[in-house]
């Protein structure tokens, strides 16, 4: 009756009748936003990289591979990069990852190795603030030894980053 139509009238070729539903004609609509999955970009083909590639999709990560010459396409607000080059173009891969300004960058390697790379990155013109955002060694300290264990420790750290990012509590310094 709000638009001048009553029960029994015809409207757009249909006969109008009273709705017998207890809702009296109201409809509840549930909207679930669909956001792109977080992206994990892996530099390198080391055993840890391969293990991470297999494990990460099980936890909702879209996995992409990149190298110092191939820039990955970014389609998510949350992008993390893991450099697992194992001595193969470490500096070039770290440089490429840092330039893309992802949410998080981690380096699979020792603190000593990363210390030498930090000096080279600084000499290449990278700001200390950008270099300081790289987490090295990658992963949580769980005493991991095998590539699978190391990839699990990295993934646990990435899940922590993802949860904090979604809750608005992500802090690049942590």
Q: Whereabouts are the PLM-identified features?
A:
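Short phosphate-binding/catalytic loops that engage adenosine nucleotides
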Residues: 61, 102, 126
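Segments forming oxygen-rich coordination pockets for charged ligands
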Residues: 1-80, 113, 119-122, 157-174
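Rossmann-like adenosine-cofactor binding region
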Residues: 74-107, 112-116
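Adenosine-phosphate binding glycine-rich loop
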Residues: 108-112, 116-174
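Glycine-rich Rossmann-fold phosphate-binding loop(s) that bind the pyrophosphate
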Residues: 45-46, 86, 143
């Amino acid at each position: 009756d709000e638009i001048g139509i009553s029960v029994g009238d015809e409207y757009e070729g249909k006969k109008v009748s009273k709705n017998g539903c207890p809702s009296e004609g109201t409809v509840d609509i549930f909207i679930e936003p669909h956001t792109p999955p977080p992206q994990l970009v892996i530099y390198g083909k080391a055993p840890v990289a391969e293990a991470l590639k297999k494990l990460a999709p099980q936890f909702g990560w879209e996995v992409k591979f990149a190298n110092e010459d191939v820039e990955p396409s970014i389609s998510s607000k949350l992008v993390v990069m893991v450099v697992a080059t194992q001595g193969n173009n470490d500096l070039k891969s770290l440089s490429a990852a840092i330039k893309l300004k992802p949410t998080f960058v981690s380096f699979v390697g020792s603190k000593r190795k990363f210390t030498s790379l930090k000096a080279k990155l600084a000499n290449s013109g990278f700001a200390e603030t950008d270099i300081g955002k790289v987490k090295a060694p990658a992963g949580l300290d769980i005493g991991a030894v095998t590539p699978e264990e190391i990839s699990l420790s990295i993934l646990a750290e990435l899940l922590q980053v993802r949860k904090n990012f979604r809750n608005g509590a992500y802090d690049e310094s942590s």
